[in-house]
Amino acid sequence: MAVACGQDGVAGDCRFLGDLFVMWLEQSLSAILYVLTLLPMPDFMKGQSIGGMLGNAGSTILWFADVFMIGPALVMIGAAMIFFLLRRVLTLGIW
């Protein structure tokens, strides 16, 4: 007969395994972040900004941004995020 978590006093073991997984995940992600911080920035990206790179991208990229309405889409995403956060604050996270 298999014993599930929470039966016959093994609930503590299940919590321990869950905590062990969380600790392993945290250490793994920290190691990946550490390795990424060791990588040097490419020379072509030094002193660049997103606006400067988009300005140098050419008319084709700007045409696609205009056709797909990237600007209004970002405004709508920002408005949705503000609405979500404001709703959470005003309803104390219930709704």
UniProtKB/Swiss-Prot annotation:
GO CC aspect terms: host cell membrane; membrane; virion component
Keywords: Host membrane, Membrane, Transmembrane, Transmembrane helix, Viral penetration into host cytoplasm, Viral penetration into host cytoplasm via pilus retraction, Virion, Virus entry into host cell
Subcellular location: Virion; Host membrane
Alphabetical GO biological process terms: symbiont entry into host cell
Transmembrane portions of the chain: 20-40, 44-64, 66-86
Membrane-topology descriptor: Multi-pass membrane protein
Subunit structure: Interacts with G3P; this interaction is required for proper integration of G3P and G6P into the virion.
Summary of the function given for this chain in its UniProt record: Plays essential roles both in the entry of the viral genome into the bacterial host and in budding process. The formation of the G3P-G6P complex termed adsorption complex is essential for correct termination of filamentous phage assembly.
Family affiliation: Belongs to the inovirus G6P protein family.
Name of the protein: Head virion protein G6P
Lineage: Viruses, Monodnaviria, Loebvirae, Hofneiviricota, Faserviricetes
Gene name per UniProt: VI
